[in-house]
């Protein structure tokens, strides 16, 4: 099962605005458990502002639905000046080995 990493950045002075949209997101856009599950959500600050990272484990055959869901969620933040995001698909080690025609020992 692949993992989706959703990383966002925003300026500290926009934190209240982002938090308000996030509260709305929690009410209206949580992914269906049939798509997978969130493994972790973390927040920190760095030289680029405030950064959040979510790791979502995708159930087999649900990748496109999950990507659509997270792109729809990020659209909620588009009017916040300075808000940026990145969505990445990461493979598990087993999936990466399969691309090479290999599998781990049992």
Could you describe each region identified by the protein language model?
Residues 72-74:
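Charge-dense, low-complexity polyampholytic segments
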């Amino acid at each position: 099962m692949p993992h989706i990493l959703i990383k966002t950045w925003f300026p500290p002075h926009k934190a209240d605005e982002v938090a308000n949209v996030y509260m709305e997101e929690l009410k209206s856009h949580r992914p269906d458990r049939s798509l997978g599950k969130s493994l972790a959500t973390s927040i920190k600050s760095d030289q680029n502002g405030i950064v959040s990272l979510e790791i979502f484990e995708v159930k087999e055959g649900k990748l496109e639905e999950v990507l659509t869901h997270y792109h729809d969620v990020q659209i909620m933040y588009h009017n916040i000046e300075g808000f940026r995001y990145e969505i990445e698909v990461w493979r598990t080690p087993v999936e990466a080995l399969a691309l090479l025609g290999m599998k781990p020992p049992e």
